[in-house]
Amino acid sequence: MENYTVQPAKSVRGEISVPGDKSISHRSIMFGSISSGVTKVTGFLRGEDALATLQAFRAMGVQIDDDGETVTIQGRGLHGLSEPTDVLDCGNSGTSMRLLTGLLAGQNFFSVLSGDKYLRARPMKRVVGPLALMGARISGRAGGEKAPLAIQGSKLIGIEYDSPVSSAQVKSAIMLAGLYAGGETVVREPHLSRDHSERMLRAFGAHVETFPGGVKVRGGAELTGRDIVVPGDISSAAFFLVAALIVPGSDLLIRGVGVNPTRTGIIDVLKGMGGDLELTNQRDESGEPVADIRVRHSKLTAMEICGEVVPRAIDEFPAICVAASLAQGTTVVRDAAELRVKETDRISAMADNLRRAGVNIVETPDGMQITGVASLKGCAADSFGDHRIAMSMMVAGLVAQGETSVSDVECIATSFPGFVNLLDGVVQR
């Protein structure tokens, strides 16, 4: 397992672009594969998670070519996938597994989904349960709670489902099954989760309607291939936003970041803490809002983070924890129990690591209380095999007194293979 040592930084300065959005990259492969005609994707994220989705569709007979600039998908149509001859390996990707479970439930063949030890430990009943109500035949370990999942494609019927969690993965899995189901499928959720599936499926020609609190899909519509430009991933930009806010003397411009309003919780939170962030050059690309973000070092103040902003910032909480650890006062996070079932328990992991760095943190079942300190201590941090924990603690190391080492950093390749080089390029020492 590879460790990485971080030295304190004098400032974070320059202009960068972050890799393509992971959520949109996954969906571009999935939706392009079940469309008729050609889909061309630029800005595709070549991280391990999105590549797992790409390889899964190749294993189901889809021709996908990648010349390093553009990913070209020769769509097979809604019913054109072939039965895979082997287990579909989702690696560490919960998005791959959960969305594929919905998509495969309505096929006319058998398939098996598995992944690495971390993915095999994550809860799948939240997807398997509602799909079973649609007529899906899915079995797995622990009564369908854990992967591997065996899926015998079957005839599906539309349902109305009130999701107990605000999860784009749950919503999207049900929507994808709804493409193959008779009648209408309706999903409601407590707070709006990211809406990339709704936007993109509509662009491909699916019958998708949104309404306050939910989405409706009518089955049977044929999808048509299209060109997609993937914006920069705001979840990847988050580490640089926090780095520039907490390192004195910093001034950083991040170009071409996706600022879909269902994903900009990180911006709302950091601004709420007093962060100097400015969105410029706002435009629309492939149905997604995009902007450049300028961020400067700021004195941060604690705040309460709860309610509807939580699902809009769910993947950015490890980075938010680092910002909160240096904010004046006590930051209270509530309504974020979903963090406990990510690649690792992110509440426990960040609490453990930041305590090592000298921060006073109290865990709660659905969040934490973080009392900021004047400075962090260098420490030996543990990534727990989670890419976002690893990158967050590397950012924390930029302002720590002394050296910070982070264990098992190869997990970063799941979402951001070039992170270390990009960070080194803007850190002044």
Curated annotation (Swiss-Prot):
Binding positions for 3-phosphoshikimate per the UniProt entry: K22, S23, R27, S167, Q169, D315, K342
Subcellular localization: Cytoplasm
Pathway: Metabolic intermediate biosynthesis; chorismate biosynthesis; chorismate from D-erythrose 4-phosphate and phosphoenolpyruvate: step 6/7
Gene3D superfamilies per the UniProt record, alphabetical: Enolpyruvate transferase domain
Domain of life: Bacteria
Binding site for phosphoenolpyruvate: K22, G94, R122, Q169, R346, R388
Catalytic activity: 3-phosphoshikimate + phosphoenolpyruvate = 5-O-(1-carboxyvinyl)-3-phosphoshikimate + phosphate
Main location (coarse class): cytoplasm
A biological process from GO: chorismate biosynthetic process
CDD domains given in the database record: EPSP_synthase
EC id: 2.5.1.19
GO MF, one example: 3-phosphoshikimate 1-carboxyvinyltransferase activity
InterPro entries: Enolpyruvate_Tfrase_dom, Enolpyruvate_Tfrase_sf, EPSP_synthase, EPSP_synthase_CS, RNA3'P_cycl/enolpyr_Trfase_a/b
Active site positions, chain numbering: D315 (proton acceptor)
GO CC list: cytoplasm
Residue runs in coiled coils: none
Keywords linked to the UniProt accession: Amino-acid biosynthesis, Aromatic amino acid biosynthesis, Cytoplasm, Transferase
Similarity field: Belongs to the EPSP synthase family.
Assembly behavior: Monomer.
Function: Catalyzes the transfer of the enolpyruvyl moiety of phosphoenolpyruvate (PEP) to the 5-hydroxyl of shikimate-3-phosphate (S3P) to produce enolpyruvyl shikimate-3-phosphate and inorganic phosphate.
The name this protein goes by in its record: 3-phosphoshikimate 1-carboxyvinyltransferase
Lineage: Bacteria, Pseudomonadati, Thermodesulfobacteriota, Desulfuromonadia, Geobacterales
